[in-house]
């Protein structure tokens, strides 16, 4: 008989095993160590063990749903950080029960919406979430650049790029944040990860900004509408490439009319 417990009530090893087994046949091969799992999924991803649930068959963990709560774009939100079920335990209601616990937890904490991301091609998961009442609101796109010679120099004499501290970055970009940002790129997530921040200034006024880590993952890049197509964004990337000795760049973002 399958039993269900809060993840805060069990050993973290059981949570990790459920995650690892549930993603053992994922369409993208995932090799996540226990340490990386804890650091990422119970760190910047925002999941908390007390908001997460585990399915157990005796002393074997067979499914897990991770949950995290925060005010996301001014709405109290419960996000599903992952839902994973052991391949041998699919189709018998484990996912359904884990989701019921997840939803009830959200209601108990006054959340107004449920939120998650699912990869294109995982049709079984997409069908499951649609059946539960989820609706697609955004598409996430991911891009990589391995040939950084394509970041061409432009004549940007009037643009000065400066290193920023996180508090300055956070305050300065508020004037631009009138569009949807995905969970992994929002300010709360950025604050908990290791990043470098740059600002592009024209006559001491911020006209563009970049957040990038030392592996070249861009979490934020934005240029003021009146200063686009004159090399501001390119200048930010040039400086980051040179100072951080980057060999590649990657970025992911939702569809937007910006």
Spans of model-derived segments:
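A short beta-loop-alpha structural element at the N-terminal edge
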Residues: 2-17, 154-172
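Alpha-helical interaction/dimerization surfaces of two-component signaling modules
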Residues: 18-22, 105, 128, 132
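Acetyl-CoA-dependent GNAT
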Residues: 21-76, 81, 86, 167-219
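Residue-level recognition of the GNAT/N-acetyltransferase active site
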Residues: 81, 86, 90, 119, ...
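Conserved acetyl-CoA-binding loop-helix of GNAT-fold acetyltransferases
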Residues: 85, 91-104, 130-131, 229-242
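Conserved active-site alpha-helix within GNAT-family acetyltransferase domains
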Residues: 92, 96, 108, 120-138, ...
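Conserved GNAT acetyl-CoA-binding A-motif
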Residues: 106-117, 244-255
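C-terminal "cap" of GNAT-fold acetyltransferases
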Residues: 112, 119-121, 138-167, 254-257
